Amino acid sequence: MRDIGIDVKPPERECEDENCPFHGTLSVRGQLLRGKVVKVYGKTAVIERELIRYVPKFERYMKKRSKLHAHNPRCIRARPGDIVTIGECRPISKTKSFVILEVVGNEGNKS
């Protein structure tokens, strides 16, 4: 297992995935984001982030949601409902430019 230079808890399982930042050759650089896993299919997970924006015209706050596709390595195995930390990497496919780095908690147990 290699050190990726980011302060996250490394996975306990091993994997043979080339696109794993811990066991493969994928480098992580750029943004680090946190969100909830909404859907998992194959090696891809859909991460939903909830953003709160201030609207000056109405002097109120508005909730917005954004969805990102992230690579889900076999050693991490994030499931729907998990709160995860994702990191930006090179484009893995047409829509995936992020990889899941760690599972922080579950939907009912936010940390």
UniProtKB/Swiss-Prot annotation:
One GO MF annotation is:
structural constituent of ribosome
Listed InterPro entries: NA-bd_OB-fold, Ribosomal_uS17, Ribosomal_uS17_arc/euk, Ribosomal_uS17_archaeal, Ribosomal_uS17_CS
The UniProt entry, under Pfam families, shows: Ribosomal_S17
Can you supply one Gene Ontology CC term for this chain's record?
cytosolic small ribosomal subunit
Q: Which UniProt keywords apply?
A: Ribonucleoprotein, Ribosomal protein, RNA-binding, rRNA-binding
GO BP, sorted A to Z: translation
| Cross-referenced PANTHER family | 40S RIBOSOMAL PROTEIN S11 FAMILY MEMBER, 40S RIBOSOMAL PROTEIN S11-RELATED
Give a short account of what the protein does.
One of the primary rRNA binding proteins, it binds specifically to the 5'-end of 16S ribosomal RNA.
Describe its assembly.
Part of the 30S ribosomal subunit.
The record's comment on protein family reads: Belongs to the universal ribosomal protein uS17 family.
NCBIfam families per record: PRK08572.1, uS17_arch
Would you tell me the protein name for this molecule? Small ribosomal subunit protein uS17
Q: Which organism is it from?
A: Archaeoglobus fulgidus (strain ATCC 49558 / DSM 4304 / JCM 9628 / NBRC 100126 / VC-16)
